[in-house]
């Protein structure tokens, strides 16, 4: 499986997700919603698995490879959110968010090889990346809910956001813990306040602040939605935005400095 074949798998997966989203929006033929969405996920994962086999390493090293996982998990998170709360529009927006990162990958192809630097040859590598990407996708759904709630002014969306943030921050915390164990093994320190690590803490603190504000239940709905949106933006900064900062050019977390 080569990167050149990604466009074929991506188009098929996006078409399936689009069919599922339209069926959900119309509120009819639930079997079509699940069949189309799951088919898209299967096609997308088939490409990831094919890359894994052909590269003889987990496709998690480059930024483009992590975007693959995010798009895949975004589809899963959107489907789970739809199953739980039955919002007809959630699959459309989750598919749209996944599509954004798929398009970035199509517009910015990478060179993929079998090399894997020593720091990435760790038992913590795969669980850290997958848990983090899944947490990002769940929090991506919370971002979608926050945007929708901000414009529709519905209280129920805030309760949905609560549940998504609780799950998302739980996985985010586990991902940070796995990352610290990995850092200890690879570089000798659990935490070094590297630029990426600093932004990880800022992101985590933003969602933790939301959780605490909800516990007191004295903060306005609009403020909470804005906080979720800002927290998601810091998450994007932590994921890839920090790579463009001058201070991050010597970061130990830049595994592929050409991407």
Indicate residue ranges for each PLM-predicted region.
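Polytopic transmembrane helical bundles with strong interfacial aromatic enrichment
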Residues: 1-259
């Amino acid at each position: 499986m080569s990167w050149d074949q990604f466009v074929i798998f991506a188009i098929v997966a996006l078409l399936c997700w689009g069919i599922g989203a339209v069926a959900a929006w119309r509120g009819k033929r639930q079997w079509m919603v699940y069949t189309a969405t799951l088919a898209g996920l299967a096609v997308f994962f088939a490409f990831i698995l094919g890359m894994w086999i052909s590269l003889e390493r987990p496709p998690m090293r480059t930024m483009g490879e992590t975007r693959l996982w995010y798009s895949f998990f975004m589809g899963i998170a959107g489907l789970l959110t739809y199953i739980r709360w039955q919002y007809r529009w959630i699959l459309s927006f989750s598919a749209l968010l996944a599509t954004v990162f798929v398009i970035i990958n199509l517009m910015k192809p990478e060179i993929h090889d079998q090399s894997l630097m020593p720091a990435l040859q760790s038992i913590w590598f795969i669980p850290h990346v997958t848990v983090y990407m899944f947490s990002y996708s769940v929090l991506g759904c919370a971002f979608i809910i926050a945007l929708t709630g901000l414009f529709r002014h519905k209280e129920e969306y805030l309760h949905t956001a609560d549940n998504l943030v609780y799950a998302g921050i739980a996985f985010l915390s586990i991902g940070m813990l796995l990352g610290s164990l990995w850092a200890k093994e690879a570089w000798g320190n659990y935490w070094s306040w590297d630029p990426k690590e600093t932004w990880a803490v800022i992101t985590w603190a933003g969602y933790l602040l939301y959780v605490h504000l909800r516990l007191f239940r004295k903060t306005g709905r609009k403020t909470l939605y804005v906080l979720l949106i800002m927290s998601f933006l810091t998450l994007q900064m932590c994921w890839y935005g920090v790579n463009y900062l001058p201070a991050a050019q010597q970061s130990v977390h830049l595994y592929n400095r050409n991407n």
